[in-house]
Regions:
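Metal-coordinating catalytic core of metallo-dependent amide/deamination hydrolases
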Residues: 127-226
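Divalent metal-coordination and catalytic microenvironments
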Residues: 7, 24, 29, 51, ...
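Active-site gating loops and adjacent loop-to-helix segments of metal-dependent hydrolytic enzymes
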Residues: 69-101, 140, 214-226
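Flexible loop residues that form catalytic
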Residues: 12, 64, 123, 149
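Divalent metal-binding segments
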Residues: 77-128, 182-189
Length: 226
């Protein structure tokens, strides 16, 4: 048993209570109790928190974790040419191992900053999801990889792939659908495909992520086209 004392604890209980001069009791890998320090017996395995603040883990709901190696490229560029000139060429040329390294870098940086769970909205279907899952488990961060899925794919193929990926025994990692939708002029909408994807996700009990009105331009396009 380990006891971390002399900390301010920000809780997630119904009252959103903040406990000053608090303590956290840990057994094995689990937090089993939090309370005022004075309410715990002295423990030889005590750690003095030095008045620091203990926060619940943060959740990043939109993290392009596989693009960390592009940092510094395309600064101040509009998002459309950034995709055309930087992101798309990178994705077409990178290897599985480059993707793994990029994701690992993002995971480590997130953990250091207090993020304990993230969602990657457009995970490349050519990535090795077993390697990504192993990396996530080794680093100790929860991950949701949304497999990028387009109307060009045969439904049975991506459904079988999604089913297989979610049958792995990894409690830290889930694989959802990262849906390809139109965002700029020239893109084509596929309403029947979107309905099929929704039905598949409902049947499999899995999640769905997509970009929607994330920029000024595609908000107008969405309004007129969908």
């Amino acid at each position: 048993m380990t006891l971390i004392q002399d900390i301010t604890i920000v809780t997630m209980n119904p009252d959103r209570e903040i406990i000053t001069n608090g303590a956290i009791r840990i057994e094995g890998s689990k937090i089993v109790a939090i309370d005022k320090s004075e309410n715990f017996p002295e423990s030889p395995a005590s750690i003095n928190g030095g008045g620091m603040v203990a926060l619940p883990g943060l959740i990043d709901t939109h993290a392009h974790a596989d693009q960390s190696l592009l940092r510094g490229l395309g600064d101040q560029m509009h998002w459309v040419p950034f995709l055309d000139k930087i992101v798309d060429p990178y994705l077409s040329e990178r290897s599985i191992h480059h993707s793994l390294l990029a994701n690992q870098l993002s995971m480590i940086e997130m953990i250091k900053g207090g993020t304990t769970c993230f969602l990657s909205p457009n995970a490349d279907p050519t990535d090795d999801f077993n390697l990504l899952s192993e990396a996530s488990s080794n680093i100790g961060i929860r991950a949701i990889f949304c497999r990028f899925t387009t109307a060009k794919e045969k439904t049975r193929a991506w459904v079988n792939n999604l089913t297989d990926l979610n049958q792995r025994n990894n409690k830290l990692v889930d694989v959802w659908v990262g849906l390809d939708i139109p965002r700029v002029q020239g893109d084509t909408a596929h309403p029947d495909f979107y309905r099929d994807v929704r039905q598949v996700c409902e049947r499999l009990g899995t999640g769905l992520a997509y970009h929607f009105c994330s920029e000024f331009e595609d908000s107008g396009y969405m309004y007129n086209c969908l």
